[in-house]
Protein backbone atom coordinates (compact mmCIF):
# COMPACT_ATOMS: atom_id res chain seq x y z
CA UNK A 1 0.00 0.00 0.00
CA UNK A 2 2.80 2.44 0.85
CA UNK A 3 4.86 1.38 -2.18
CA UNK A 4 2.72 -0.03 -5.02
CA UNK A 5 4.75 -2.44 -7.10
CA UNK A 6 7.63 -2.42 -4.61
CA UNK A 7 9.37 0.23 -6.69
CA UNK A 8 11.28 1.83 -3.83
CA UNK A 9 11.38 -0.79 -1.06
CA UNK A 10 12.45 -4.39 -0.50
CA UNK A 11 10.51 -6.49 2.04
CA UNK A 12 12.67 -7.77 4.87
CA UNK A 13 10.35 -9.59 7.27
CA UNK A 14 6.66 -9.71 8.09
CA UNK A 15 4.18 -11.10 10.57
CA UNK A 16 0.97 -10.70 12.50
CA UNK A 17 -0.27 -9.84 15.97
CA UNK A 18 -2.33 -12.46 17.77
CA UNK A 19 -3.01 -14.30 21.00
CA UNK A 20 -0.44 -16.58 22.60
CA UNK A 21 -2.00 -18.94 25.13
CA UNK A 22 -0.89 -21.72 27.44
CA UNK A 23 -2.78 -24.91 26.62
CA UNK A 24 -2.41 -26.16 30.20
CA UNK A 25 -4.07 -23.02 31.58
CA UNK A 26 -6.74 -22.34 28.95
CA UNK A 27 -9.32 -25.10 28.62
CA UNK A 28 -11.46 -23.69 25.80
CA UNK A 29 -11.01 -23.01 22.09
CA UNK A 30 -9.22 -19.73 21.42
CA UNK A 31 -10.40 -18.09 18.21
CA UNK A 32 -11.59 -14.64 19.26
CA UNK A 33 -10.33 -11.52 21.00
CA UNK A 34 -13.29 -12.02 23.33
CA UNK A 35 -11.29 -14.34 25.57
CA UNK A 36 -9.18 -11.37 26.70
CA UNK A 37 -12.27 -10.07 28.49
CA UNK A 38 -13.08 -13.35 30.29
CA UNK A 39 -13.13 -12.68 34.03
CA UNK A 40 -11.88 -16.19 34.87
CA UNK A 41 -8.49 -15.18 33.46
CA UNK A 42 -8.18 -12.20 35.78
CA UNK A 43 -4.52 -11.34 36.48
CA UNK A 44 -3.42 -13.82 33.82
CA UNK A 45 -3.76 -11.63 30.72
CA UNK A 46 -0.88 -9.71 29.14
CA UNK A 47 -1.60 -6.77 26.85
CA UNK A 48 0.79 -4.84 24.64
CA UNK A 49 1.96 -1.57 26.17
CA UNK A 50 1.34 0.11 22.83
CA UNK A 51 -1.45 2.49 21.92
CA UNK A 52 -2.04 1.24 18.37
CA UNK A 53 -1.64 -2.45 19.24
CA UNK A 54 -4.04 -2.31 22.19
CA UNK A 55 -6.57 -0.13 20.41
CA UNK A 56 -6.21 -2.39 17.38
CA UNK A 57 -7.28 -5.38 19.49
CA UNK A 58 -10.30 -3.53 20.88
CA UNK A 59 -11.33 -2.05 17.53
CA UNK A 60 -11.17 -5.40 15.72
CA UNK A 61 -13.10 -7.08 18.55
CA UNK A 62 -15.82 -4.46 18.08
CA UNK A 63 -15.87 -5.08 14.33
CA UNK A 64 -14.12 -1.86 13.32
CA UNK A 65 -11.00 -1.09 11.33
CA UNK A 66 -7.80 -0.88 13.34
CA UNK A 67 -7.18 2.32 11.39
CA UNK A 68 -10.42 3.90 12.55
CA UNK A 69 -10.60 7.68 12.87
CA UNK A 70 -14.24 7.67 13.99
CA UNK A 71 -14.36 9.25 17.44
CA UNK A 72 -17.32 7.12 18.60
CA UNK A 73 -15.55 3.93 17.56
CA UNK A 74 -12.41 5.10 19.33
CA UNK A 75 -14.20 6.01 22.55
CA UNK A 76 -16.06 2.68 22.46
CA UNK A 77 -12.70 0.93 22.12
CA UNK A 78 -11.32 3.02 24.97
CA UNK A 79 -14.21 2.02 27.22
CA UNK A 80 -13.67 -1.63 26.31
CA UNK A 81 -10.02 -1.37 27.32
CA UNK A 82 -10.96 0.36 30.57
CA UNK A 83 -13.42 -2.44 31.30
CA UNK A 84 -10.68 -4.98 30.64
CA UNK A 85 -8.01 -3.30 32.75
CA UNK A 86 -8.86 -5.03 36.10
CA UNK A 87 -8.27 -8.37 34.37
CA UNK A 88 -4.85 -7.42 32.98
CA UNK A 89 -1.77 -8.62 34.84
CA UNK A 90 0.53 -6.22 33.00
CA UNK A 91 0.98 -4.07 29.93
CA UNK A 92 4.23 -5.29 28.41
CA UNK A 93 6.30 -5.37 25.25
CA UNK A 94 9.27 -7.75 25.12
CA UNK A 95 8.47 -9.09 28.60
CA UNK A 96 5.51 -11.01 27.19
CA UNK A 97 7.94 -13.67 25.94
CA UNK A 98 9.49 -14.47 29.31
CA UNK A 99 6.21 -14.28 31.19
CA UNK A 100 4.51 -16.70 28.83
CA UNK A 101 7.48 -19.08 28.70
CA UNK A 102 7.62 -19.27 32.50
CA UNK A 103 3.86 -19.77 32.85
CA UNK A 104 3.24 -16.49 34.66
CA UNK A 105 0.21 -15.77 32.47
CA UNK A 106 -2.33 -17.76 30.51
CA UNK A 107 -2.90 -15.35 27.62
CA UNK A 108 -0.84 -12.67 25.94
CA UNK A 109 -1.06 -10.40 22.92
CA UNK A 110 2.14 -10.99 20.99
CA UNK A 111 3.88 -10.62 17.65
CA UNK A 112 4.05 -13.82 15.62
CA UNK A 113 7.85 -13.95 15.49
CA UNK A 114 7.98 -13.80 19.27
CA UNK A 115 5.41 -16.60 19.40
CA UNK A 116 7.67 -18.91 17.40
CA UNK A 117 10.53 -18.24 19.82
CA UNK A 118 8.35 -18.90 22.88
CA UNK A 119 7.10 -22.20 21.46
CA UNK A 120 10.69 -23.39 21.15
CA UNK A 121 11.13 -22.75 24.85
CA UNK A 122 7.69 -23.95 26.00
CA UNK A 123 5.75 -26.40 23.78
CA UNK A 124 2.58 -25.81 25.82
CA UNK A 125 2.17 -22.44 24.10
CA UNK A 126 0.00 -21.93 21.03
CA UNK A 127 -0.66 -18.91 18.81
CA UNK A 128 -3.79 -17.87 16.96
CA UNK A 129 -4.92 -14.98 14.79
CA UNK A 130 -8.42 -14.19 16.09
CA UNK A 131 -11.30 -14.58 13.65
CA UNK A 132 -12.16 -10.88 13.87
CA UNK A 133 -8.80 -10.12 12.29
CA UNK A 134 -5.66 -8.35 13.43
CA UNK A 135 -2.61 -6.44 12.28
CA UNK A 136 -0.46 -7.84 9.49
CA UNK A 137 2.75 -5.88 9.17
CA UNK A 138 5.88 -5.78 7.06
CA UNK A 139 9.35 -4.31 7.59
CA UNK A 140 11.08 -3.14 4.43
CA UNK A 141 14.45 -1.77 3.36
CA UNK A 142 14.65 1.56 1.54
CA UNK A 143 17.56 3.74 0.48
CA UNK A 144 17.21 7.52 0.98
CA UNK A 145 17.59 9.50 -2.23
CA UNK A 146 20.50 11.44 -0.70
CA UNK A 147 22.34 8.35 0.55
CA UNK A 148 26.10 9.05 0.26
CA UNK A 149 26.97 5.38 -0.37
CA UNK A 150 24.11 4.08 -2.50
CA UNK A 151 26.11 1.23 -4.05
CA UNK A 152 27.08 -0.09 -0.61
CA UNK A 153 23.47 0.09 0.53
CA UNK A 154 22.34 -1.83 -2.56
CA UNK A 155 25.04 -4.45 -1.97
CA UNK A 156 23.90 -4.87 1.63
CA UNK A 157 20.27 -5.35 0.61
CA UNK A 158 21.26 -7.78 -2.16
CA UNK A 159 23.25 -9.77 0.41
CA UNK A 160 20.29 -9.96 2.78
CA UNK A 161 18.07 -11.10 -0.10
CA UNK A 162 20.25 -14.10 -0.89
CA UNK A 163 18.10 -17.16 -0.06
CA UNK A 164 20.78 -18.74 2.15
CA UNK A 165 21.29 -15.50 4.10
CA UNK A 166 17.55 -14.84 4.37
CA UNK A 167 17.17 -18.37 5.77
CA UNK A 168 19.89 -17.79 8.38
CA UNK A 169 18.24 -14.53 9.33
CA UNK A 170 14.80 -16.15 9.69
CA UNK A 171 16.20 -18.92 11.87
CA UNK A 172 17.83 -16.32 14.12
CA UNK A 173 15.11 -13.66 14.46
CA UNK A 174 12.14 -16.07 13.97
CA UNK A 175 10.15 -13.45 12.10
CA UNK A 176 8.62 -14.60 8.81
CA UNK A 177 10.67 -14.20 5.67
CA UNK A 178 8.97 -12.92 2.50
CA UNK A 179 11.75 -14.60 0.51
CA UNK A 180 10.04 -17.58 -1.13
CA UNK A 181 13.33 -19.18 -2.14
CA UNK A 182 14.51 -18.99 1.48
CA UNK A 183 11.30 -20.61 2.70
CA UNK A 184 11.88 -23.54 0.34
CA UNK A 185 15.25 -24.08 2.05
CA UNK A 186 13.68 -24.55 5.50
CA UNK A 187 14.34 -28.19 6.32
CA UNK A 188 11.94 -28.49 9.25
CA UNK A 189 8.59 -29.18 7.59
CA UNK A 190 6.66 -28.06 10.67
CA UNK A 191 8.32 -24.65 10.47
CA UNK A 192 8.09 -24.40 6.68
CA UNK A 193 4.33 -25.03 6.87
CA UNK A 194 3.77 -23.23 10.17
CA UNK A 195 0.52 -21.28 10.36
CA UNK A 196 2.30 -18.91 12.75
CA UNK A 197 5.15 -18.03 10.41
CA UNK A 198 3.23 -18.42 7.17
CA UNK A 199 -0.54 -18.02 7.71
CA UNK A 200 -2.76 -18.74 4.73
CA UNK A 201 -5.11 -16.32 3.00
CA UNK A 202 -8.09 -17.42 5.07
CA UNK A 203 -6.28 -16.58 8.32
CA UNK A 204 -5.32 -13.17 6.94
CA UNK A 205 -8.72 -12.38 5.41
CA UNK A 206 -9.75 -9.94 8.15
CA UNK A 207 -6.29 -8.56 8.85
CA UNK A 208 -5.13 -5.04 8.06
CA UNK A 209 -1.88 -3.12 7.96
CA UNK A 210 -1.54 -0.11 10.23
CA UNK A 211 -1.49 3.17 8.33
CA UNK A 212 -0.30 6.58 9.44
CA UNK A 213 -3.40 8.52 10.46
CA UNK A 214 -1.83 11.95 10.81
CA UNK A 215 -0.56 13.88 13.82
CA UNK A 216 -3.99 15.06 14.94
CA UNK A 217 -5.48 11.57 15.01
CA UNK A 218 -2.32 10.22 16.65
CA UNK A 219 -2.79 12.80 19.40
CA UNK A 220 -6.39 11.63 19.87
CA UNK A 221 -5.29 8.01 20.18
CA UNK A 222 -2.60 8.98 22.70
CA UNK A 223 -5.03 11.00 24.83
CA UNK A 224 -7.50 8.12 24.90
CA UNK A 225 -4.71 5.66 25.77
CA UNK A 226 -3.47 7.82 28.64
CA UNK A 227 -6.96 7.69 30.14
CA UNK A 228 -6.99 3.91 29.83
CA UNK A 229 -3.64 3.58 31.59
CA UNK A 230 -4.62 6.04 34.34
CA UNK A 231 -8.11 4.63 34.95
Give the location of each predicted region.
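Conserved C-terminal helix/tail region of periplasmic/extracytoplasmic solute-binding proteins
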Residues: 201-231
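A ligand-binding cleft/hinge motif common to bilobed small-molecule-binding domains
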Residues: 101-102, 107-124
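Short, hydrophobic alpha-helical packing/hinge segments within bilobed ligand-binding/sensory domains
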Residues: 33, 96-97, 115, 153, ...
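A bilobed periplasmic-binding-protein/Venus flytrap-type ligand-binding module shared by bacterial periplasmic
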Residues: 18-25, 60-63, 137-149, 168
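Ligand-binding "clamshell"
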Residues: 1-6, 117-129, 190-195
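Periplasmic-binding protein-like
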Residues: 74-83, 89, 121-147, 191
Amino acid sequence: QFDPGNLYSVPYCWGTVGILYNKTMVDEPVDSWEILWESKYRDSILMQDSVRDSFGVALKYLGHSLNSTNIKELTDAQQLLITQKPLVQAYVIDQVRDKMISGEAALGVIYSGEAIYTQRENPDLEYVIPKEGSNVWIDSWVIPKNAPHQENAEASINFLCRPDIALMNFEYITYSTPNEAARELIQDEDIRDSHIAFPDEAELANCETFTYLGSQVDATYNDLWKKVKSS
